[in-house]
Amino acid sequence: MVWQCVEAGLVDGRKIFVDSSLVDADASNNSVIDTRSLRVQLQEGYKKLEARLEEKSESTDSTRRYVKENRRYISTTDPDAAIVNRGRPKLSYQVHRAVDGRSEVITATEATPGDINEAHEMIPLLESHHLNTGIKANTVVADSKYGTVENFLACHDRGVEAHMPDLQESTAKRIEKLNIFPEERFEYDGESDTYRCPAGNRLKPRSLHKSRQSRDYAASQKVCAACQIRKQCTRNKSGRTIKRHLREEELDGMREASRSAKAKRDIKMRQHLMERSYARGTWYGFDRARWRGLWRVQIQEYLVSAVQNIQVLLRYGSYLKTSPSVMMEQIKRAMTRDIRSFLDYAELMSSKIVQSVLFRFIYRRLSFIEG
C-alpha cells in the first residue's frame, strides 16, 4: 500500500516525522504478578529445568527482537505487554510511526512492548522508510525524547539532518532550576584539551569510558573544595565532573543544526501532523489491542496503517478517477495480496482462523467506502 502511494506521487520521502503512542493491552492489571514472589518456587525446580534446557536446541526463537530482561512485574494473560506508569499504571504496547509530510502517508510502523525507549526505534523506522518507499530520507523530525547522543551520531553517519531538540538541553534546564551551573558555562580549550570552569579553574582529562565513548574532565578535589562558588557548581563531595564525547565536534554540529529556524518550524509542524495521524487511527481502534501477543498487535498496527493510507490514496490519488466498483475491487485485490504475503512470511498460512479474522477485520474497516 505504501508503494502504491509512492507511485501515485503522494510520498515525497525526503523528510519524515517520527513519534510513538501507547496502545492499551487486552489484559487487566489484576493479571500482573510479582516475579520476586516466585523466586523460592523457581529455585526448587531450577536444577530439573536446567537439565531439560540442556537437552533442548539453543535456537528455539532466535528471531525474537524484544526479550524481557529483569522485568519484575509480568502479566500472566499477556506476557509481552509491559506496565507503563503515565498517570496511572496500565498494561500497554507502544506503536512507533514514520509519516511523510506531503500527504501524511504512514511509510513505516513498528509495535513494541510499552516499556521500550522510543529513542531506540528512530533509526529502525528510518531504515524501514527507505526499504518501503525506495527513497532515502535526508531529514528526520522528532521531539526531545529522540534527541539522544546515539541518534544524533547515527543521523550524522547517514547524512541525515536531525530536526529534534537535544535531550541534554532538557536536562540542563532541570539543573538550572536547582541553581547549578549547566555544562555550557564550562569553556573547552581544544589546544590544551581542558575545560575552564566559571571560577577560572582548569578541568583536566581523567578517566575514559569506552562503552559510553566519553571522557571525564575534573579539577583536583582540593581546588574544588576551596572554591568560593562551589555550592553553585556541584553538591558532589568529589567535585564537579564534565563528560565529553569522543565525537563532540560532530555532535555540536548536529545540535547546532537542530536549533535552526527551519528545524524549529519542522518540530512545530510535527506536533500537529503526528497528532492527526494517531487521532485518525483511533477511528479504527489502534489505541486498544484486539488480540494478545506482540506479533498480533504488530499485525493490527499494519492493518490500521494500511486503512489510513487507503484513505489518503482515495482522497488524493489516481483512484479518484476510477468508478467506485472498480476502485473497490482494486483495493480488495491489493489488500488481499499484501496480507497473504505477510502471512507467508510469518508462517501463518496454515491457520485458517487467523486468515479469516484478518480478512474480516480489514474488509469491515473498508466497508465505509462501499457505503
Give the role of each language-model region:
Residues 1-371:
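Anion-binding and metal-coordination hotspots
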